[in-house]
Amino acid sequence: MLSCEADDPKSFYGGTDLLDIVESAWVSFRDGDYVISLETFQEAKDMADEQGGTDTLLMHATYGNIHTGIGWCNLRLLNADSAKWHFTKSQSYVLYSFGTSVGLMAAYFELGNEIPIDTTQINVAIEIGHWIFSSGMGEEFENDITINVSDVKLLMARSYYAKGNLSNNTDLEIGALYWILQLDPGYVYLNGDPVTWNLYDSGTQDFDSFDEIILMILRALESEVFPA
């Protein structure tokens, strides 16, 4: 038990100083300064490690938050394998966290979305996505509300596209088109006319394949979900 508990009501979280460093790391993350954010999260982890004798559920929450932050920084810096490790570590402290879960899903997707496609990794990403929707957790990440349920739906659509499943299977909630429609129901007319698509309201355009149509839609949706 920390000696500062009597004077610091946040001692069970690791203390005010530690929480301030963690919040500073998230501020840098939200500002897009991922390298600085990663360094600050690592500083927070080092401080938390020095308090190894403190074993409370609230301290576990702080550790989970730190590892989630390190995971997201690595994901933004294109280190998906390291990101996966830290998200998994975070879940060992706090299982039901939207931000951690969608980060882990994204890490598995990035690891699987290579040439050749690693369907094992993609399948895990899909499993996590279905679990997010069935678990009843919130629909946005409290530390960065730009990370929300739309990211999960887009990742589901991209994952099914990577596997070659372009369907709209409403019974099983699978297929790239199914998850596209969860993001934007306006594409529902593709069910009846799958070989044409009105691109940006500029007139009907013909495509060589349904695969090409789905790919173009995914690119358009990415620009909406992840605006520049």
Regions found by a protein language model. Name each.
Residues 2-27:
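Bacterial Sec-dependent N-terminal signal peptides
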Residues 10-12, 46-63, 92-99, 130-149, ...:
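Flexible helix-coil transition and linker loops at the boundaries of alpha-helical arrays
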Residues 14-16, 21, 55-64, 69, ...:
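Structural signature of alpha-solenoid helical repeat junctions
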Residues 31, 70, 77, 111-113, ...:
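Structural motif corresponding to the intra-repeat A-B loop/turn of tetratricopeptide repeats
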Residues 34, 41, 87, 122, ...:
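Hydrophobic/aromatic packing residues within the alpha-helices of TPR/SEL1-like helical repeat arrays
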Residues 37, 83, 117-118, 125, ...:
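Single-residue signature of alpha-solenoid repeat helices
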Residues 143-147, 154-158, 162, 166-228:
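Terminal, low-structured helical/coil segments at or just beyond the last alpha-helical repeat
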